[in-house]
Amino acid sequence: TAHDPLIRMALVPRMLEARGLDVTPGIMRRFEAIGDHETAAVLQIILREEVGHVQFGSRWFHYLCEQRGLEPEQTYFDLLENFLNGEIRCPLHHEARREAGFSNQELQRLEALCAGG
């Protein structure tokens, strides 16, 4: 993605880092279950910071789409299809993704692409 910042913003913050938003709550629960509350608290801080990273990428992605006359949502899903064969892993952390700049419609479309259903 180094050759195109639009592609980088779509795939690094809005796909890879956003996946961190999805999986962190489950990891936190596992640490809580074994009594490691300190690690769970650290992961909560990391989750909050990760929302900011994804939000930053979302803003830049939308800005770059606007500069190129591209519709952001369709462009994002076209890139997911081209680079990931349109398949993603779930579950999604809807609240964190919304806070990070994903629309409800994007979340619905992402859910439809989840592996296995």
Predicted segments, located by residue:
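Non-heme di-metal
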Residues: 1-117
